Regions:
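Membrane-embedded helical hairpins/re-entrant loop segments and their flanking transmembrane helices
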Residues: 7, 14, 18, 28-36, ...
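Membrane helix-loop-helix hairpins that form the core translocation module of multi-pass transporters
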Residues: 34-143
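Context-gated lysine
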Residues: 2, 81-84, 149-152
Length: 186
């Protein structure tokens, strides 16, 4: 089947339903593409990226105030912006920004794995296995996770563990939110 308006609608629905659940929207999109045999799968990657950019846009709109504050705090940390007269630093926001940076650092080496991971997007069996693995990971986190740590009790090593989980979740079918939530609970 060539890519059509109907298949694009299906993909938009999958993306919209799956993105914020711990079920790997990318994995579900790949399964849908493999199942429907939509055109040249390599050409579909651009459409998938656009779907994810649309989701990112929605997140930016929903959290624009917090994101603006994080950006402002980051610029002040780098001394690229002076605080307004009478304004004071925001230690909780600065702490959150530091944790976000630490949790993002493990993704840098993952960027170089693209050539190895790309073929897995075409392997429906592998993606299905990874989706099941995400389910077991969530079950383990629910059963064995401590889950009682507050934001104030979080440490840099916790942020790093969440970042490492995020790095592992670049594997097609593993849910980034599912793995990071599980890492945070365990």
């Amino acid at each position: 089947i060539k890519s059509s308006a109907a298949s694009d609608v299906y993909k938009r629905q999958v993306q919209g339903l799956a993105e914020f659940l711990p079920i790997s929207s990318s994995g579900h999109l790949a399964i849908l593409q493999n199942f429907l045999r939509i055109g040249n799968l390599e050409n579909q990657m651009l459409f998938d990226v656009l779907l994810h950019l649309g989701t990112l846009g929605a997140v930016i709109i929903a959290y624009h105030t917090e994101l603006r504050g994080l950006c402002r705090e980051g610029l002040m940390m780098l001394h690229l912006k002076k605080p307004k007269r009478g304004a004071r630093q925001d230690p909780p926001r600065r702490r959150l920004l530091l944790f976000l940076i630490v949790a993002t650092l493990p993704l840098i080496p993952a960027a170089f794995l693209n050539d190895y991971l790309d073929p897995l997007f075409y392997d429906t069996f592998f993606i299905g296995f990874a989706l099941i693995a995400t389910g077991f990971l969530l079950l383990a986190a629910d059963r064995f996770g401590h889950g009682n740590k507050t934001e104030k009790a979080m440490t840099l090593s916790d942020a790093l563990m969440i970042g490492l989980a995020q790095m592992i979740a670049v594997v097609p079918g593993l849910s980034r939110s599912g793995t990071t939530i599980s890492a945070g609970m365990l």
